[in-house]
């Protein structure tokens, strides 16, 4: 590969890294071409971009990223990079599901919002809620709190009326 082409690849990967909420490194050594096509289709369905890039070029593209040194340590053998643009957890779910049936696909490492996740943390990553799901849960909790305020106020008023009524009956 000529120098200009390498620079273009580094620039392209750097741009993808800057747009991504989550970056995942995988090893796919021993994965057949048909299985690799299946994997790419699964990633595509989940809104994830998956690229195979030379390790040295990925290392250069990740150099400005928080945790780049740790990620660079995982750049050995064949490396595929998954970019989660809208959902940083989507690649983890695809990798976990696909690797159950395909032992040739291995999760190496991930970086989400500057936090680096090791290979043994794939299960935790894949079970995390998305931002949208977390926002929905928070909105539900806030809604429940807001809805319970009038009930509490009504209970206080009802109790006050009951006390006044009892005092009135005792005075008669």
UniProtKB/Swiss-Prot annotation:
One of its GO terms (biological process) is translation. It holds the Pfam family Ribosomal_L10. InterPro entries: Ribosomal_uL10, Ribosomal_uL10-like_sf, Ribosomal_uL10_bac, Ribosomal_uL10_bac_type. GO terms for cellular component: ribonucleoprotein complex; ribosome. Signal peptide: none annotated. Part of the ribosomal stalk of the 50S ribosomal subunit. The N-terminus interacts with L11 and the large rRNA to form the base of the stalk. The C-terminus forms an elongated spine to which L12 dimers bind in a sequential fashion forming a multimeric L10(L12)X complex. Forms part of the ribosomal stalk, playing a central role in the interaction of the ribosome with GTP-bound translation factors. This is Large ribosomal subunit protein uL10. It comes from Chlorobium phaeovibrioides (strain DSM 265 / 1930) (Prosthecochloris vibrioformis (strain DSM 265)).
